[in-house]
């Protein structure tokens, strides 16, 4: 195990499900004066994204939990983007944040950190500088290595990219390898960093949610009980339930076969 992530008071249980989440913590502590200041300020800005975007859910969850007024502007890059958007995000991707003060930010991790930092009393960024770098480590790892491998598994099965059985199998194996990093870390701990919920948990469950919605079926979850239990636990916390109407969860994953219908953007 990475000694930088050594367990503290581990309370993790691999068989945790929605029915057993009886001691889920409430929202992170929010100072009353901070809430009032945020309300008085009005709109914090706009977030260009699409509904249930894995890269936006965590941002929206944190913003709502601390009382930030963050407007969602619907934008699905797969359907094309308006001309003005290229000035905000030269790659035409989402999410993009445009603050009420004119600040423009791309990249979900940068946006999430900016939003979280608006609460001066937050516990979501850890209790030490070492906690903070571990939070960055987990979000970066998930947003790059994990999401990229998951996307290579899912996209050919939904018609977004050309289908190849061998390439899908390769992506499946690579995803399994990456998720193994989570599984090993969560064997003896409840959260990814320290002994309480952090931005790492919030952003990482959001980023992997499309896997649980399409490919991480019952058989797959049984092979990764700690990772799957952690996902269910965090997704059922009030901070996530406030923005996720129904936790993404599939009983039978997409088969490794050519898609039967043309791709439709969500």
UniProtKB/Swiss-Prot annotation:
GO terms for cellular component: cytoplasm; nucleus. Glutathione binds at residues 93, 107-108, 143. Its EC number is 2.5.1.-. Induction: Expression is positively regulated by the cluster-specific transcription factor pbcR. The keyword Transmembrane helix does not apply. It holds the Pfam family GST_N. SUPFAM superfamilies: GST C-terminal domain-like, Thioredoxin-like. Residues 128-259 form the GST C-terminal domain. Keywords: Transferase. One of its GO terms (molecular function) is transferase activity. Substrate binds at residue 93. Coiled coil: none annotated. Residues 43-123 form the GST N-terminal domain. Glutathione S-transferase; part of the gene cluster that mediates the biosynthesis of the diterpene ent-pimara-8(14),15-diene (PD). Within the cluster, the HMG-CoA reductase AN1593 functions in the mevalonate pathway, which produces isoprenoid precursors. The geranylgeranyl pyrophosphate (GGPP) synthase AN1592 is needed in the formation of GGPP, the precursor for diterpenes. Lastly, the pimaradiene synthase pbcA performs the 2 cyclization steps that convert GGPP to ent-pimara-8(14),15-diene. Belongs to the GST superfamily. This is Glutathione S-transferase AN1595. The lineage of its organism: Eukaryota, Fungi, Dikarya, Ascomycota, Pezizomycotina.
């Amino acid at each position: 195990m990475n000694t930088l992530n050594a367990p503290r008071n581990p309370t993790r249980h691999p068989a945790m499900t929605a029915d057993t989440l009886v001691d889920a913590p409430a929202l992170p502590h929010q100072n009353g004066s901070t809430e009032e200041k945020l309300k008085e300020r009005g709109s914090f800005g706009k977030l260009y994204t699409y509904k249930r975007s894995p890269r936006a859910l965590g941002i929206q969850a944190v913003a709502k939990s601390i009382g930030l007024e963050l407007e969602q502007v619907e934008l699905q890059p797969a359907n094309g983007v308006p001309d003005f958007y290229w000035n905000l995000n030269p790659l035409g991707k989402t999410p993009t944040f445009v603050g009420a003060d004119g600040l423009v930010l791309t990249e979900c991790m940068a946006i999430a950190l900016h939003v979280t930092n608006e609460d001066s009393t937050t516990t979501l960024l850890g209790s030490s500088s070492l906690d903070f770098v571990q939070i960055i480590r987990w979000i970066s790892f998930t947003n790059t290595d994990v999401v990229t491998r998951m996307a290579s598994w899912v996209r050919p099965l939904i018609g977004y990219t050309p289908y190849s059985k061998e390439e899908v199998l390769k992506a499946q194996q690579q995803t399994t390898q990456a998720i193994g990093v989570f599984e090993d870390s969560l064997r003896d701990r409840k959260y990814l960093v320290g002994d309480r919920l952090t931005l790492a948990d919030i952003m990482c469950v959001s980023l992997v949610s499309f896997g649980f919605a399409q490919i991480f079926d019952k058989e797959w979850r049984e092979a990764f009980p700690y990772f799957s239990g952690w996902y269910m636990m965090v997704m059922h916390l009030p901070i996530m339930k406030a923005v996720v109407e129904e936790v993404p969860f599939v009983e039978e994953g997409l088969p490794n076969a050519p898609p039967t219908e043309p791709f439709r953007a969500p």
